């Protein structure tokens, strides 16, 4: 039983195709503090590791370990790792498991070419952070390969390099054949950023380019991180819950309604007009005053809900604009000018009170311009360029990358192939919207 209800808000929940699932669900049923699916998702993100057994076999056969351009001639090992995937998986499970009834899970995928490892929660409980998942799995995997193929002490370092790449001298594990959704803790921008350390392409790959699920996954991780960072606390908790509900989970079918209204002939500007109309209809904003020119200014009736509506509109604008182009490159300018137009049109603050718009200025430069260091898909909420918005800027990027028709050099297929193959085989990673709604229905009557 949840001891107290803080907010009177209720939402209607829809699936990824815009079909009503449940009406009048308490807002707190989708809170990371109460929703069992979100809690499981966060836990599984931390304890799940993707292993590329075919990649390890190829690295050892060619001597190409430690990243691009690193090849050690004369140190090749021809080991039939994929052929013996079941033996290796059994050994890894034996080493990783703590007790017979714990939640350890080892799953071979794609005829043994890849493997999903979920370490037991007990190992996570006695760790300070999530590195334990990769490091324990890697150690068990190295031992399994060494024991299975009787690798001697002189060749064992090659097994290490094939599994962990350049680690430990390269802390990002460049060239490794093991991966987690969360990036290295050593790359965190500051305290509390860990759950935001997932590139947009990973969300796209995990959900197999399903727009609504990718947006949901991104929003869940970004907004759950706000609880860790201390942003979604006190007066600001409701703002973040509404943002998660409307932008991430398509509450009241707002995102899909806006896309339907503008999908055929719409632009970013017409999406803005639709958001304003819907907000007026729903009593979220109201007319404030009319200037001598006839221009109308608005004021919020509920500022947190206005932000949620604006954030949902931002995702809709991304879907309409990037979807029309079949390309993701314009997502930075879409985030920027959606907010710019919205502010000029209404006199109200843009998404996240200007932080999404400000993020988009730097995002435009660093994904285009004279720098152009990476496409939109490689950015995340922990990136120095895109960290500034409090959870509202990454979901539209995930939407845009789902709609890209192969125009990106940094495509999900290039950056997230292993992650996508392994994590998409796990239901709640592939269809987070469905399972978060299921979790909300489990707890709604207890609130």
UniProtKB/Swiss-Prot annotation:
Family to which this protein belongs: Belongs to the methyl-coenzyme M reductase beta subunit family.
- Tell me which stretches of the chain form a coiled coil: none
Question: Required cofactors, per record?
Answer: coenzyme F430
Which residues does the record give as coenzyme M binding sites?
371
Q: How does it assemble?
A: MCR is a hexamer of two alpha, two beta, and two gamma chains, forming a dimer of heterotrimers.
User: Could you name the domain of life of the organism this protein comes from?
Assistant: Archaea
- Protein's UniProt keywords contain Transferase: yes
Pathway assignment reads: One-carbon metabolism; methyl-coenzyme M reduction; methane from methyl-coenzyme M: step 1/1
**Catalytic activity, reaction form:** coenzyme B + methyl-coenzyme M = methane + coenzyme M-coenzyme B heterodisulfide
Protein localization: Cytoplasm
One GO cellular component this record assigns the protein to is:
cytoplasm
Matches recorded under SUPFAM superfamilies:
Methyl-coenzyme M reductase alpha and beta chain C-terminal domain, Methyl-coenzyme M reductase subunits
Q: Can you quote the record's cofactor note?
A: Binds 2 coenzyme F430 non-covalently per MCR complex. Coenzyme F430 is a yellow nickel porphinoid. Methyl-coenzyme-M reductase is activated when the enzyme-bound coenzyme F430 is reduced to the Ni(I) oxidation state.
Q: What does this protein do?
A: Component of the methyl-coenzyme M reductase (MCR) I that catalyzes the reductive cleavage of methyl-coenzyme M (CoM-S-CH3 or 2-(methylthio)ethanesulfonate) using coenzyme B (CoB or 7-mercaptoheptanoylthreonine phosphate) as reductant which results in the production of methane and the mixed heterodisulfide of CoB and CoM (CoM-S-S-CoB). This is the final step in methanogenesis.
Annotated organism of origin = Methanocaldococcus jannaschii (strain ATCC 43067 / DSM 2661 / JAL-1 / JCM 10045 / NBRC 100440) (Methanococcus jannaschii)
Class of this enzyme:
transferase
Q: Which InterPro entries match?
A: Me_CoM_Rdtase_asu/bsu_C (IPR008924), Me_CoM_Rdtase_asu_N_sub2 (IPR015823), Me_CoM_Rdtase_bsu (IPR003179), Me_CoM_Rdtase_bsu_C (IPR022679), Me_CoM_Rdtase_bsu_N (IPR022680), Me_CoM_Rdtase_Fd-like_fold (IPR009024)
One GO MF term on file is: coenzyme-B sulfoethylthiotransferase activity
**What is the protein name given in its UniProt record?**
Methyl-coenzyme M reductase I subunit beta
| Any one GO BP annotation for this protein | methanogenesis
Keywords in UniProt for this one? Cytoplasm, Methanogenesis, Transferase
Q: What is its EC number?
A: 2.8.4.1
Report residues binding coenzyme B.
Answer: 373
